[in-house]
């Protein structure tokens, strides 16, 4: 039994790291195009891919919506300032995975290189406790099915914000 637990732990860590390494980039989301060959993605792409890979290996996975604040990340004020009509509080996609009969929060959003910019990066994950989350600030978690979006984000601002954020994160 202990050998099987170790094998599962190694597998979940390996899959987490595989998806975590994919560079973060805000871009169009099409669930049908998510596969192991994506070369970049945001929380939607990366959580969807990790969910698919984990379920393929027999893990129980739940989709989670997390409300976070972009202000809690190390993003230049000039980029945050683009959001004039839109709030900085946005919904985020993440996962819960059942590991050893316990639901564990697993967030693979930020690729390791973003640690240099002050983003919360999970390193050497133990495969059994919560990973670091999207920010170290205040977060609210919802089961995907229970989440009702009440946040009004203006599309033009969001697109400009995403464009500038992508430039900053890839620099």
Specify the residue positions occupied by each region the protein language model found.
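Solvent-exposed, well-ordered amphipathic alpha-helical segments
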Residues: 1, 7-14, 58-59, 99-100, ...
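Secondary-structure boundary elements
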Residues: 1-42, 46-51, 105, 168-169
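Hydrophobic/aromatic-rich core segments of domains that either
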Residues: 11, 48-135
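Generic alpha-helical secondary structure signal
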Residues: 28, 123, 129, 145-146, ...
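Alpha-helical and coiled-coil interaction segments, frequently adjacent to or embedded
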Residues: 134-171
């Amino acid at each position: 039994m202990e050998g099987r637990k170790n094998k599962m732990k190694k597998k979940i860590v390996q899959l987490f790291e595989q998806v975590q390494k994919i560079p973060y980039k805000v871009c169009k989301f099409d669930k049908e195009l998510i596969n192991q060959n994506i070369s970049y993605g945001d929380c939607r792409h990366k959580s969807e891919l990790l969910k698919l890979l984990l379920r393929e290996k027999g893990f129980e996975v739940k989709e989670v919506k997390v409300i976070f604040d972009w202000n809690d990340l190390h993003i230049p004020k000039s980029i945050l300032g683009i959001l004039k009509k839109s709030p900085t509080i946005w919904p985020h996609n993440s996962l819960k995975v059942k590991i050893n009969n316990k639901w564990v929060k697993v967030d693979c959003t930020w690729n390791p290189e973003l640690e240099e910019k002050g983003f919360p990066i999970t390193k050497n994950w133990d495969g059994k406790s919560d990973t670091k989350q999207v920010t170290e600030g205040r977060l609210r978690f919802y089961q995907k099915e229970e989440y009702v979006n009440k946040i009004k984000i203006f599309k033009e601002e969001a697109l400009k914000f995403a464009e500038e954020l992508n430039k900053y994160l890839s620099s």
